[in-house]
Amino acid sequence: MNKSKRLFPKSKRSFRRRLPPIQSGDRIDYRNMSLISRFISEQGKILSRRVNRVTLKQQRLITIAIKQARILSLLPFINNQKQFERSESTPRTTSLRTRKK
């Protein structure tokens, strides 16, 4: 196929390669909270390997470290911060109920 006949010409745009989320010096450990917190969602769930862009071995180590941190109560199992914010923002009205005879 000739280059002039192509329907969609290839773009020559360059792309910047993303830095890996785990550097070679980083140690995946349950005590390394700054590293572990990057791989947890706002709800407290462990993010998938595709979202994290890590290797299978790194994802396994991250998962084990997060689970150990949860057991040792360094991390919460569920993050209900939004639920508490909503309940605090709504004012409670305390009214006395009167019975009608």
Curated annotation (Swiss-Prot):
Entry's localization field: Plastid, Chloroplast
One of the protein's GO biological processes: translation
Signal peptide: none
RNA-binding among keywords: yes
Family annotation (InterPro entries): Ribosomal_bS18, Ribosomal_bS18_CS, Ribosomal_bS18_sf
GO molecular function: small ribosomal subunit rRNA binding; structural constituent of ribosome
Pfam families: Ribosomal_S18
A single GO cellular-component term on record: mitochondrial small ribosomal subunit
Keywords, ordered alphabetically: Chloroplast, Plastid, Ribonucleoprotein, Ribosomal protein, RNA-binding, rRNA-binding
Domain of life from the UniProt record: Eukaryota
Major location (coarse): plastid
Subunit description: Part of the 30S ribosomal subunit.
Family, as annotated: Belongs to the bacterial ribosomal protein bS18 family.
HAMAP family: Ribosomal_bS18
Protein name: Small ribosomal subunit protein bS18c
Organism: Aethionema cordifolium
Organism lineage: Eukaryota, Viridiplantae, Streptophyta, Embryophyta, Tracheophyta
Gene that encodes it: rps18
